[in-house]
């Protein structure tokens, strides 16, 4: 049943958690327990998993278990969100997943060799594919949510209200440096104010000053920041110069525009994801969860992995370190960008 099962005694298909209605199997959970153990042990050689690491008495082993819960919670919440919004893998997604898998098969030389690498990680081909699929679902949710005109794109009122709550402003900004920055700022402000086509004048000024034309930038206000205070004080269509707000010699010339709601949608998506994570219901199979001794599990897993690698090397099967295998054969060890 695989190395994770042999090291833990927990069947891969066992239900370790239910997060927002999504089942998290022992295989999925133990994968991230292993990952957290590898991370900590790489930085703290000979770590004592029973050593306390916090004032409330949490040990390294308990910390690993909690971190693994937080990781699988992210994946489960994405699955639940996608299901709620009827977001499924597109044909393009499936083709990309298949191509990604084939790259690893080609790298290791055969289907059999690739599956051996997954076995070294301790996960099944199906389990690995399921993890990768969630990352595509996250991307699809994000793109649909943040693309104007798409089915999940929020209405303007929702985004406007959110922008107001967070203090978002959108502006064209020119940053000037050098000894003559203050004089230049005054001249540019006067010229820009006189121009009929403000956007075209911005592009022309960027070209003349050899500045990157970033276009409209959307920023959240920062209380007590001199430049931010000046930005938020502007009305839409109003312009101003800000002289050396940070005492470093830089000056800014700004034109406030209507808030770029598409830019706001991106941060609103992140906020919603965080809210869903915080609100997620987590039901733990206490019998399975409490039975896991992280120190014993990782020690046994390391031993089994070493033995398997030695056997694979004796038959000339390409191998790397356990960490290399987790990163390469399994496609990724990255979690969705939730934090």
Region spans (language model):
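Extracytoplasmic
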Residues: 11-19, 167-173, 247-248
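Acidic/polar surface patches and capping/hinge elements
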Residues: 129, 136-172, 179
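Peptidyl-prolyl cis-trans isomerase
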Residues: 187-227
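Soluble non-cytosolic domains of exported or imported proteins
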Residues: 27, 59-76, 88-95, 127-136, ...
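Short, low-structural-confidence N-terminal segments
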Residues: 1-62, 66, 229, 233, ...
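C-terminal soluble interaction/assembly domains
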Residues: 242-271, 275
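Acidic helix-start/capping segments at beta-turn-to-alpha-helix junctions
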Residues: 50-59, 79, 89-110, 210
